[in-house]
């Protein structure tokens, strides 16, 4: 919204300069985006009249002009403008004047002394044709200072309004805001009813009453469409961003800027029969004022006569009924079109109009009569003519329901004491009707405020007018108490830090994934499909973290990163109801960073399993299990407290080939909820007595997992046994080909006494018996 500050100050003139006024508007929520001078600085330029323009004796393209500049004698000025002619009134810069980039001095031009310069718009820094002198109206007073006469000491104010403030898309609306903010008196232009002088009317019917709940029309005959638009009106239109055209059109545009009510003038002689407000019919087209012919859709509101659509309601008029210089009779239209009936239609047709911009946000349905009377009076004053009576069709207009505002809630939300009298005064200044009942205010918003509907809207208005910048800064005051820390859970940040300490880097990948990739990892998986995917390759929700981790691996390998260790903590999506959090990881390349002291080797299953055991702080129970994404001979299900907590293993060979990898990465995925649980640590004193170690070699079936044997031994172990670990797996000479030999190291220590040989032998025997009973294992000879 752009407007002239001088025009605004005709309506409300607070004791603030331009900068202070802009700051006050911005602080009240009406952001001033730009302040632009109406004209660049120049001085000593006056209105002049060319008395004569003779050809220069020594230059074909120059003229020697005698110019009346309001002084006793005419001034001689040499001019090269092609349109310099006697009788023209033009700007004249006298000697000593300073124009943008130039200072005027008395100078000889081809032997003729010139006492000033006749100016074009370009030389003054103004808009307009620059190929000749700037021609002023015939009524321009000779000798008058040009800046004062053209009101060039003005500022163009540009507001960046939010969509809810449609009431500020007019000078009256902005003036009302300034008055409420500053307390200055607001002088809203009053339009007295114009008495009809003729009885002519146009019949109006509204078929789409939901879209148009009020329509006013008026016939005005005998106008002079070629009448000159007054300079003050043309100036205000131009500074509001609207180019003056014909006087009748300028009048409707002026009312648009002043009152915020879009209007339209039809050439009455081009209308056939009455006016109907209806929805467009299939196949109808309309040639618009812009020259564009559009095909109308059935959800577009049109103004139609007997021949068909003549205007796109609330957006743009039609070419066939446009007002021209020869137009004598017009039909003025002012209406309230529902925002929902206009919104989006202009953009769909590639149009952007001031009318659509306002109707989409909501215009004041209570001021349509005032707009019609104002436009009629201006039209009669400028173009003459005889007005007819107003034809009106009114349906169900929007209602402004009362809103209850609790002063206690206002103070609590605002954080500042606002008195009832002040709140009532501020809301009344905005046009609200306010009634007080104890500590409650019952507020009825005005017809032009579509954005006031609930209590919070009124709180915003009260605080806005009080001034956001006046609310004192208060640091929050609250009791400080220590919160108990749940030591039975590991926080996500602690889990991430542990993974970083284990030499893994965190990654965050898309939750949206390619369905082909998910099904490659698990052909039987049930995918959760998105209703509106951002891309076809991101159309399902991930059911595992592995897909994103593998893509991250490939991304790094393509950038010559040969050693990759990454993890992600995030949700997977089995269904709408089941969305567990998982910890997934991947290791690829060398087990350790390259260095001279340790021979290089690739990371394997047991490296990653060891990382997870360090993460848990205890040995993991890795049992048999098959996952379609993992190598069947290099994978395991991970069990925690009797529950399957996840998977670990090398990527399946078919997927290594499918993902074009040189080797198989080792993957793991764990339920983060199981990971987060942990037992409270218990203190155990250090034993002062020596440890005893025994190495046992058990022969058992080759297909039996080492974990099964360890589980049996640990379950049978007496309290004196501190550790049971596998340190060798032998298959070969001396062991049947269907069997294997597992070497177990047993560490024993008592906290009360030194263990005797008998104690040790008894403990070992319990382990041997358990191995035989549970695993059919025997001691190797």
Curated annotation (Swiss-Prot):
Q: Which GO terms describe its biological process?
A: phenylalanyl-tRNA aminoacylation
Q: Record's CDD domains?
A: PheRS_beta_core, tRNA_bind_bactPheRS
The reaction(s) annotated as catalysed by this protein in its Swiss-Prot or TrEMBL entry are: tRNA(Phe) + L-phenylalanine + ATP = L-phenylalanyl-tRNA(Phe) + AMP + diphosphate + H(+)
Q: Any idea which positions bind Mg(2+)?
A: 451, 457, 460-461
As for subcellular location, the record says: Cytoplasm
Name the coiled-coil region(s).
none
Show the Gene3D superfamilies listed in the entry: 3.30.56.10, Bira Bifunctional Protein, Domain 2 (3.30.930.10), Ferrodoxin-fold anticodon-binding domain (3.30.70.380), Nucleic acid-binding proteins (2.40.50.140), Phenylalanyl-trna Synthetase, Chain B, domain 3 (3.50.40.10)
Primary localization class, coarse: cytoplasm
Q: Gene Ontology terms, cellular component aspect?
A: phenylalanine-tRNA ligase complex
Q: Which NCBIfam families match?
A: pheT_bact, YtpR
Assembly and oligomerization = Tetramer of two alpha and two beta subunits.
Q: What is this protein called?
A: Phenylalanine--tRNA ligase beta subunit
Q: What's the name of its gene?
A: pheT
